[in-house]
Design a protein with these regions (language model features):
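Short, hydrophobic beta-strand segments
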Residues: 42-50
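Hydrophobic faces of well-ordered beta-strands that scaffold small-molecule active sites
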Residues: 91-93, 148-150, 198-200, 291, ...
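Substrate-binding/active-site clefts of carbohydrate-active enzymes
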Residues: 100-280, 285, 304-314, 330-332, ...
Length: 592
């Protein structure tokens, strides 16, 4: 490892004053430190010369009594440091594991855990689990997804609403109602064997109020606001505002989301190190291809720099995406590595969620075309890409688990849905699709998160009427939508260099928005990408009104001897022809 020091947090009755010793000589105890609680001891080990082994660490109290515990140093997987994270050629499938598929009914309820399974309650646990994902990996792969991001599956031993996973009560333990650590590791391995990576959702900002740290806090400054609820202002702009006062910055960063989510103080170096080591441990143990960080900007700003740099030092080709829910590109861009920013902040975060583009797409398809409305919102948003260090590495999406589903946002209009999905699966960035979006799942009449995260049909043995995994019982529209997503995803797989490459777009005109994706000749990295298809282009035309469109207007990117083959029906056109496009069309062409 680049950093060979390991800090252990030891918890036990009155361990704070114990003396630490190890029999083996190749692991060195650098120091130990107690904080406020008499039940915690922090031990720093130097493992730079150590081999894989099981350590026996002895704790001797003032009376000479000895207790010991084992700590295992494991061998790293070969090539672990050079692992390649998810990237622009990928497509991410976002899953709420409790709502996707129930592969093991035996773990629906587990002794010692409250919040029992109740599928009839929208805010309750429904029984989905790791085995349900494993059982349906072929569906995910065959659709064309190459990465899976699940909402957090670490232990959430909360009294209610534990299904969503964002109230961690143990950072090193998969919630047994989802499965076990071994099952999660096996999921990652099996997915990898099918060409699918696993992105782990991590929460650095807060914990669940039933965490041990709230019953026995290691130090007085472990939790912000002295361990008492003070709500965050959510005024993220204060972190970037050159005119901001410190109290506004503190009000944003140190405030809690809700009383059941205590806000962590990452300025405490032991807590910071705990969170850093935990992330690295999961990358190593589970063979992750990426991390998604919840509420990215809310933790301490200096800590975020430390956290991202430490992880990227260990895995230079890895990818981490941060959730910064702002519709202002200047705010989201600030966090991405190599972006233009007004200060010397050192961000090593490779990717951010592109909320500005998501908002622009919905706005474009929900408004009439004019000089300042319609597709111009997408065009203007993409025109600000100069703010980002790497716009191709942004994660783009039509919706997610925290907002209304895109079909609902667009008024349950399948043509608008098609235009949105076509755009977001073909423009620059890494597309993420929320489970069920491919079959027009909606939340009509309610914006409740429990409704938005409804069960995927076919994931439960009792789902006899409809099964989206097999297609049984789907309506014609649902089946069409599923096949449309599949076709677009498979296009991405067959043309990776184009979707990792350049975006060139024309300013919208008369309700028509056109762009191409083409290979960046300077970035062709593999033999597979360096074949003849790198000369192909992908052209996308979105139009709201029926139009006769002469392809000659695109002479800058097309030549007369080229042929355009339409993805939807395989029909071919010469670049000199005129297209007759019906209203509300989303046309994708392979240009050869």
């Amino acid at each position: 490892m680049q950093n060979s020091n390991v800090e252990l947090m030891v918890y036990g009755d009155d361990v704070a004053d114990d003396t630490v010793s190890i029999a083996k000589g190749d692991v060195i105890i650098k120091h130990s430190q107690a904080l406020d609680s008499e039940n915690y001891l922090f031990i720093t080990l130097d493992t730079s010369k150590a081999s894989a082994q099981e350590l026996v660490i002895k704790l001797t109290d003032n009376d000479g009594s000895i207790r010991d515990f084992s700590y295992v140093l494991k061998e790293r997987e070969q090539g672990s440091a050079s692992r390649v994270g998810f990237g622009p050629a990928d497509a991410i499938y976002l899953i709420a594991p409790d709502r996707f598929a129930n592969g093991n009914k035996e773990n629906d309820n587990v002794e010692g855990y409250g919040d029992p399974a109740n599928r009839s309650f929208k805010g309750g646990r429904h029984g989905g689990d790791i085995q349900g994902i494993v059982d349906n990996l072929d569906y995910i792969r065959d659709m064309g997804f190459t990465q899976i991001w699940t909402m957090p599956m670490l232990e959430n031993a909360m009294d209610k609403y534990s299904y969503h996973g964002y109230s961690t009560t143990d950072y090193y333990k998969i919630d047994p109602r989802f499965g076990s650590n071994d099952e999660f590791i096996a999921l990652s391995a099996k997915a990898k064997s099918k060409g699918v990576g696993i992105i782990m959702d991590m929460v650095l900002n807060h914990i669940g109020s039933n965490h041990l740290w709230m019953k026995d806090t290691p130090s007085h400054d472990w939790i912000n606001n002295n361990g008492k609820f003070v709500g965050t202002t959510h005024k993220r702009e204060a972190l970037h505002d050159p005119h901001a006062i410190n109290s506004d910055i503190k009000g944003f960063s140190d405030g809690w989301f809700v009383p059941t989510m205590p806000d962590l103080n990452q300025r405490n170096p032991h807590l910071a190190n705990y969170l850093i080591q935990n992330a690295i441990w999961w990358v190593e143990s589970a063979g992750l291809s990426g991390i998604r960080v919840d509420t990215y900007s809310y933790p301490d700003k200096a800590f975020l720099s430390q956290w991202t740099n430490r992880i990227m030092d260990e895995y230079p080709n890895f990818n981490i995406v941060g959730e910064e829910w702002s519709v202002n590109p200047a705010i989201t861009a600030y966090w991405q590595a190599d972006s233009h920013r007004h200060d010397d902040y050192d961000s090593a975060l490779p990717s951010v969620m592109d909320f500005p583009l998501q908002t622009a797409v919905v706005k474009a398809l929900s408004s009439d075309e004019s000089w300042n409305s319609g597709f111009i919102s997408v065009y203007e948003t993409l025109a600000t890409d100069f703010l980002y260090g790497d716009p191709n590495n942004l994660v783009i999406f039509p919706d997610n688990h925290d907002m209304s589903r895109i079909f609902t946002q667009l008024g349950h209009n399948k043509d608008k849905w098609n235009m949105a999905m076509t755009l977001l699966l073909t423009t620059r960035g890494i597309p993420q699709v929320f489970y069920g979006t491919e079959i027009l799942m909606s939340n009509e009449g309610s914006d409740d998160h429990g409704i938005i995260r409804s069960d995927f049909p076919g994931g439960w043995p009792s789902d006899s009427d409809k099964n989206a995994f097999t297609g049984h019982g789907l309506t014609d529209d649902e089946r069409w939508a599923q096949q449309r997503i599949k076709a677009l995803l498979q296009l991405r797989q067959s043309h990776p260099s184009q979707f990792k490459g350049l975006l060139k777009h024309y300013a919208p005109e008369n309700g028509v928005y056109t762009y191409i994706r083409e290979t960046d000749k300077n970035e062709v990295g593999t033999a597979a990408e360096a074949n003849t298809t790198q000369s192909d282009k992908i052209m996308v035309i979105l139009n709201k009104k029926a139009v006769k469109l002469s392809l000659s207007k695109y002479a800058e990117v097309l030549s007369n001897n080229q042929t355009l083959t339409r993805l939807s029906d395989g029909k071919s056109f010469k670049a000199s022809e005129t297209l007759n496009l019906p209203a509300m069309s989303a046309s994708v062409f392979i240009v050869q």
